[in-house]
From Swiss-Prot:
It comes from Homo sapiens (Human). PANTHER family: OLFACTORY RECEPTOR (PTHR48001). InterPro entries: GPCR_Rhodpsn (IPR000276), GPCR_Rhodpsn_7TM (IPR017452), Olfact_rcpt (IPR000725). GO terms for biological process: signal transduction. The gene is OR1J2. Keywords: Cell membrane, Disulfide bond, G-protein coupled receptor, Glycoprotein, Membrane, Olfaction, Receptor, Sensory transduction, Transducer, Transmembrane, Transmembrane helix. Odorant receptor. This is Olfactory receptor 1J2.
């Protein structure tokens, strides 16, 4: 059924950030800088992995896909948010809102699956180092990434199709910076029980289960590290997992409660701040985490700068 038959609302109004008008310019500059840092930083990660043959390993294969996902993730919401900060009428068409919500959920879930695949890679590398190349072969890596994309698509498509069946009668103001699924459900004048049931069920599949897999992986990793007799071996294992653990903490720390328990009452400002954490801050920090705490990435970055300096002369 077409949106025109289901809804009398042709557009939504995004309230945006809860800031005063005189603060708009400062926050616009801040978020523009953060967005550009996200795009350029993750593009640099992808470039380094592509150019340096030493980085053609399963770990960096997953990282390159994570970098692409982070760029796409931020690009779904931040450009529209920046544009709204420069205009007085912060509207978004019904179709654009549904599309934004679809891709937001898609890349959120894809992040979760990719981070889980990286945890499995670290588990094999530390717990089964002698069989690493046999287990983490190219076919398995491609399969894990392909499944991540397919499951993410299925998840976002299920939410989107269910949402298009709802009616939006009069209220069209979204107290958010983008078209958030939970905010849209609150505006609907239809029965949203099925939507909330699917939201909770899918949330368990794409958030809780991957998180449990990560915990189990690091449980085995921790047990293996404790059996390592040398401090050098422990340091190497920790340095291998440190970057990934930081990303896991940032990602799940900011979205776990809000995504899994969407009906829990919370202030609007808190929802916006949490959303900004995982749409702006986390994608921006990921390149720094992997470049500053990873020896291979720092060496590849040094080679790139040396090559650029050589050609500049």
């Amino acid at each position: 059924m077409s949106p025109e038959n289901q809804s009398s609302v042709s557009e939504f109004l995004l309230l945006g950030l809860p800031i005063r008008p005189e603060q708009q310019a400062v926050f616009f500059t801040l978020f523009l800088g953060m967005y550009l840092t996200t795009v350029l930083g993750n593009l640099l990660i992808m470039l380094l992995i592509q150019l340096d043959s030493h980085l053609h390993t399963p770990m960096y294969f997953f990282l390159s896909h994570l970098a692409l996902t982070d760029i796409s993730f931020s690009s779904v919401t931040v450009p529209k948010m920046l544009m709204d900060m420069r205009t007085k009428y912060k509207s978004i068409l019904y179709e654009e809102c549904i599309s934004q919500m679809y891709f937001f959920i898609f890349f959120t879930d894809l992040d979760s699956f990719l981070i889980t695949s990286m945890a499995y890679d670290r588990y094999v590398a530390i717990c089964h180092p002698l069989h690493y190349t046999v287990i983490m072969r190219e076919e398995l890596c491609v399969f894990l990434v392909a499944v991540s994309w397919i499951l993410s698509c299925a998840s976002s498509l299920s939410h989107t199709l269910l949402l298009t069946r709802l009616s939006f009668c009069a209220a069209n103001t979204i107290p958010h910076v983008f078209c958030d699924l939970a905010a849209l459900l609150k505006l609907s004048c239809s029965d949203i029980f099925l939507n909330e049931l699917v939201m909770f069920t899918v949330g368990v599949v794409v958030i809780t289960l991957p998180f449990m897999c990560i915990l189990v992986s690091y449980g085995y990793i921790g047990a293996t590290i404790l059996r390592v007799p040398s401090t050098k071996g422990i340091h190497k294992a920790l340095s291998t997992c440190g970057s990934h653990l930081s990303v896991v903490s940032l990602y799940y720390g900011s979205i776990f409660g809000q995504y899994l328990f969407p009906t829990v009452s919370s202030s609007i400002d808190k929802d916006v701040i949490v959303a900004l954490m995982y749409t702006v801050v986390t994608p921006m920090l990921n390149p720094f985490i992997y470049s500053l705490r990873n020896r291979d990435m720092k060496e590849a970055l040094g080679k790139l700068f040396s090559r650029a300096t050589f050609f500049s002369w």
